[in-house]
Amino acid sequence: MKIDNMTKLAKFVKRPNRFQAYIELEGEEMMVHVPNTGRCREILLPNCTVVLREENNPNRKTKYDLIGAYKGEKFINIDSQIPNKVVYEALYNKKVESLAKYNIIMKEKTFKNSRFDFRLENDEGEVYFLEVKGVTLEDKGVARFPDAPTERGAKHLKELVEAKKSGYGAGVLFLMQMDNISEFRPHDEMDKMFGEALRYAAINGVDVMAYECSVDEKSITLTKSVKIVL
């Protein structure tokens, strides 16, 4: 998918809280919005090059969103609103082979008391619930999730198991918001409960998928599957 708004390069200064960061743009220090509540400590380092997306909204306090950063030569998109859009595009274009038979794609649909990112349906009326997780944490080609504890993430996985036991298809797709990934693993050192929930889901028939992206400052597209090590 293309990023239509104007983007600019800047220098990262600091991040006082989850939603705000200070950057230096054309010699001026200013506050920007960070559309990611994760820690991103391995990415947002002082003086690293970041990418800003201009937001033309007069009601906002900040003019820019910080949507990505360079970790050495690797560009990583950190916008938490991007993964669902990228996966929707991939589902529509039949890029996720195991889900290609589903022609109806509905966003943000409920199952009992749960809300999943996607509800898919094929011509035979078979229903599949899909949850998407964006991944920004990487070390030497190994991607991990989460980069901060997430009770909500573990809850989603257990709810997918309930959907599977009720006769529906169910899966979780981890989207690497970067390229050149050798494998994906749950980040047990950060959140053991999530790792246990992911393995529990897999044992109980929930599909676990991982895909990397072709990504640059103006676009991000799902490309190929990544090896999963649980």
From Swiss-Prot:
Superkingdom of origin organism: Bacteria
GO molecular-function terms, A-Z: DNA binding
InterPro entries assigned: SfsA (IPR005224), SfsA_C (IPR040452), SfsA_N (IPR041465)
UniProt cross-references to CDD domains, sorted A to Z: SfsA-like_bacterial
PANTHER family: SUGAR FERMENTATION STIMULATION PROTEIN A (PTHR30545:SF2)
Family classification: Belongs to the SfsA family.
Protein name (Swiss-Prot/TrEMBL): Sugar fermentation stimulation protein homolog
Lineage of producing organism: Bacteria, Bacillati, Bacillota, Clostridia, Eubacteriales
